[in-house]
Structure formats: C-alpha cells, structure tokens
A protein has these predicted regions:
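Short solvent-exposed loop/turn micro-motifs enriched in small/polar/acidic residues
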Residues: 8, 49, 142-143
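Beta-strand signatures of extracellular beta-sandwich domains
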Residues: 41-45, 146-150, 193
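A cross-kingdom feature marking solvent-exposed beta-strand/loop segments within repeated
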Residues: 14-15, 22-30, 37-39, 45-75, ...
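N-terminal "mature head" segments of proteins
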Residues: 1-25
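Surface-exposed interaction/gating patches
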Residues: 19-36, 100-158
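Terminal connector regions
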Residues: 1, 55-58, 69-118, 158-162, ...
Length: 201
C-alpha cells in the first residue's frame, strides 16, 4: 500500500527591513508526516523581485522557517510568496531506521538555553542582539550547525536572522551572540532553531 504524504503546510511570508534597500524574507513551513521527509529547491518571488534558488529540507513531524536575508531591492518587495522549483518526498525506511524517533532524539540533542534579547550601544548606533548558549548533548560531532533565530512580539513574528556555528563537538557548550543593525519593535520571545539534516546520506 502506497501512502500519500500529507501536503506541506506553508504560512504567508514575512518581510522586514528596508534599511539601505535590504530586506529579509521568511516563511514557516511544517511537515505533519511521521515517516516522510522532503528535500527541495525554493525561492521567493513577487510582483517586483525574485530570489536565487536555494536548496532546503524538512524532517518528519517538524516545522521550520525558510529564510532569505539581505535581499537587495530599491523598493519594498510586493506580493511575496514561497515557491518550489523542485520538491521530493522520501519515506523513512524501517530497515535503515527501526526506531526513527529514537534516532532523531539521539542525533538532534541540540538545545539553546539562557536566551536573551537586548541592545548594545556603539558609536555607529545601537545594535539589537540575541545571546544564547548552545549545548550539544549528543554523542556526535557537527562540522557546521546552521541556526535560525526568530523574534516574536507575543505570537507575531517581528524579525529573524541566521548564524552558522563551526565544529561543534559532542557534549560541547558554546555561548553565541547574533546582532541586528536595523531597528526592531519590542521582542517578548526568541526561538533558536538548529537546522541539521540528519537524513542526508
């Protein structure tokens, strides 16, 4: 019996920025399937812009933000939407992963703690910054750990950024700070989302 995947859910894109004609775009996607993951090539398009294609993925039973930071545009991007140039579902093999939930828990034991949002004053102006401590509680080393940082005011997304941490060793704890040069509204919550494809052969 071939099971049809539950379609990916996608929220409408957010657009932030405008300082020096640079904009940040992002959209949240969610995969409700328990035994299927997807890889894809995506881009953002609109009435007056189109970004370059980028490869991405989403694991089973997960949600994440797809981001495009620093888009150069003389005018604010209009009618933005997330589109896929290619998209493939992959079923998780019971033979290869007899207990995928356990496999995921063991491999993605990356947690962010002591998350704070604040401001730093410089001669060039004030910077917004997020600080956090990333702990790799797994038995695995990671050459790179891409991380998405999502800022909220209540339930509303008000900004995002990314950082990639290099050479995170098993059981390592690392303090990290990420800055924003542009102004931001009051932030009440910060999500730190490590983004590692543990199913990429």
């Amino acid at each position: 019996k071939i099971l049809t995947p539950i379609p990916l859910s996608m929220a409408d894109p957010f657009i932030f920025g405008g300082k020096e004609d640079k904009y940040d775009l992002g959209a949240e996607i969610a995969n409700a399937n328990e035994a299927m993951w997807a890889d894809f090539e995506y881009k953002f398009i609109g009435a007056n812009f189109e970004t370059k294609p980028v490869k991405g993925f989403i694991l089973p039973k997960s949600r994440k933000f797809i981001l495009e930071l620093g888009l150069n545009s003389p005018a604010r991007p209009l009618n933005a939407r997330l589109v896929f140039n290619s998209f493939s579902w992959h079923r998780i093999s019971k033979h290869t992963y007899p207990d995928y939930a356990k496999y995921q828990t063991e491999h993605l034991a990356l947690t962010a703690s002591e998350i704070t949002f604040g401001h730093t004053a410089l001669q060039s102006g004030a910077l917004n910054q997020v600080s956090f401590t990333l702990t790799n509680a797994s038995s695995y080393h990671f050459w790179q750990v891409p991380i998405a940082i999502i800022l909220f005011r209540g339930d509303q997304v008000v900004g995002f950024n990314t950082v990639t941490l290099e050479k995170i060793r098993s059981l390592e704890t690392r303090n990290t700070t990420v800055t924003w040069a542009e102004g931001l509204p009051a932030v009440t919550r910060v999500e730190v989302q490590p983004d590692i494809n543990i199913l990429d052969a």
